[in-house]
């Protein structure tokens, strides 16, 4: 899909499904490559992030959601029944109908399938991502671990650190440090962009993965909580170590 068509589709989605407020636009990267890291906030998160960021992004998507046979199972349990409150067999029919649209749309938008539970196949995710980054483009990652319980206040699940491997691979292949931009999406139709956190190649691999993961998680939680208490301006000044 060409960029013009991408922005047209995103604009339509934004008009009907989001129409929210972007805070911290001055923190957006002036050029790529870069990686955006965001909380998920159920179905609203991906829509909010894609519609708010004024550049084309390539989101990481669970591989099963891009498989025409497996996607209805995921969608039925995670969205149609849990969020739309449909019951079987109607939920099954609705899921299949939605997937006939969503799966082709994911591919058209340039989404990258993520094989998080399959270590060997995760290499394919990284290879595709490297191709995107080396073209100076942008990737969007929602690193919450869906297998773990949500925090009752932030509605977030603990982050996984697989996204940090992008920094490792990019530095190995280019000798440059990749920037990761935190995004905090709130249910009041507000999205905050924070200042970038830069991959540090001087740290041991394991330490840097943990550092990026924890720093990004803490930063996004901090920005979210400032939005929660209604102070959008301080959401941009969350201190990072």
What are these regions (language model features)?
Residues 118-241:
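Non-catalytic C-terminal accessory region of glycerolipid acyltransferases
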Residues 19-21, 58, 110, 179:
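Conserved beta-strand segments of alpha/beta enzyme cores
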Residues 30-116:
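Catalytic core of membrane glycerolipid acyltransferases/transacylases, capturing the structured
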Residues 27, 49-51, 103-105, 130-134, ...:
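Short, charge-rich binding segments
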Residues 3, 10-42, 51:
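Helix-to-loop junction immediately C-terminal to a conserved catalytic motif
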Residues 5, 9-13, 102-105, 129, ...:
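Hydrophobic alpha-helical segments of integral membrane proteins
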Residues 26-28, 63-65, 117, 186, ...:
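Short, solvent-exposed coil/turn elements at secondary-structure transition points
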Residues 8, 19-25, 45-46, 99, ...:
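A generic local structural motif
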């Amino acid at each position: 899909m060409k960029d013009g068509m991408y922005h047209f589709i995103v604009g339509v989605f934004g008009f009907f499904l989001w129409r929210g407020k972007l805070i911290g636009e001055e923190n957006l990267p002036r050029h790529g490559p870069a990686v955006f890291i965001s909380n998920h906030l159920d179905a609203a998160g991906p829509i909010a992030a894609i519609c708010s960021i004024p550049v084309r992004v390539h989101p990481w998507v669970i591989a099963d959601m891009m498989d025409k046979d497996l996607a209805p199972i995921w969608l039925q349990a995670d969205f149609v029944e849990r969020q739309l409150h449909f019951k079987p067999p109607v939920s099954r029919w609705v899921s299949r109908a939605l997937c006939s649209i969503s799966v082709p749309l994911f591919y058209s938008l340039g989404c990258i399938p993520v094989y998080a539970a399959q270590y060997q196949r995760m290499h394919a995710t990284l290879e595709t991502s490297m191709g995107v980054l080396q073209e100076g483009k942008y990737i969007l990652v929602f690193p919450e671990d869906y297998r773990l319980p949500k925090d009752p206040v932030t509605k977030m699940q603990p982050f996984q650190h697989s996204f940090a491997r992008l920094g490792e691979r990019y530095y190995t292949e280019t000798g440059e440090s990749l920037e990761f931009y935190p995004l905090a999406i709130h249910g009041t139709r507000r999205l905050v962009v924070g200042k970038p956190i830069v991959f540090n190649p001087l740290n041991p691999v394991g330490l840097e993965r943990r550092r990026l993961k924890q720093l990004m998680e803490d930063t996004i939680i901090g920005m979210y909580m400032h939005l929660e208490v209604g102070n959008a301006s301080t959401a941009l000044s969350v201190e990072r170590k």
